[in-house]
Amino acid sequence: AVTALTAQNTTGVRGILACSPEFLGQQVDAVFEDIRPDAVKIGMVPSKALVQMTADRLRFHRAERIVLDPVMVATSGSRLMETETAAVLEKELMPLALVVTPNIPEAEILAGMKIREKSEMEAAAVKIWEKFGCAVLVKGGHSVSDADDFLFDGRKGEWFCGKRIDNPNTHGTGCTLSSAIASNLAKGYSLSESVRRSKDYLSLALAEMLNLGAGSGPMDHGFALTGTFAE
């Protein structure tokens, strides 16, 4: 289901056109009433009304294995969601999620604390779980923990360590990771195994060093496909 259309390329976003809440609800109903998804990934939801509609329809259809990428703050620190919309997301969507995947700035907001080192990533994950009752994958950045992420599921914590790949084309890495986690959950893997497999996939996609566009381009999602174009 599409929450908003964007006009963008590798150099930046030129415009965002949000769907109406009613049309979003129709999209969700159309999917669940025909080919029920085994997992759901939620990304950018740009308004309070759209957050509320998303939560209402997912509750109605008793959606399972929900992966929520909050998309509240960019890794640069820029706010991507209004404070009022974020409050509705915390109240309505967070409790429905199996796992939420905040970056460091988002985890700081959700946990109400600063994160400067790996022990604080662990503490923030526990605080978020205590507030919302969902598993938490705090995504590290090289300013805190290189490419290491911390998962807390309410019972135990687990580090997923990765090697930082010096690739400037990282557009969509957070969205890719959360989508890959949902895909692996849909295939029947545990949350821990889904995170591990998804991080491996993301690392391989980045390692291909795809170079498209004049700005920060995407990674190579189709790296496993081989062959050449016809001349």
Regions found by a protein language model. Give the residues of each.
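Conserved phosphate/ATP/ADP-binding segment of small-molecule kinases
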Residues: 83-157
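Short, small-residue alpha-helix embedded
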Residues: 108-109, 167-191
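Charged C-terminal helix
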Residues: 192-231
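Short pre-catalytic strand/loop immediately N-terminal to key active-site residues, enriched for Gly-Thr
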Residues: 157-171
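Short glycine-enriched, charge-decorated loop/helix-capping segments at active-site entrances
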Residues: 12-18, 78-83, 112-116, 166
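Short, charged, surface-exposed loops that flank catalytic or proteolytic processing sites
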Residues: 114-121, 186-196
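Conserved N-terminal subdomain of the carbohydrate kinase-like
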Residues: 1-75, 79, 227
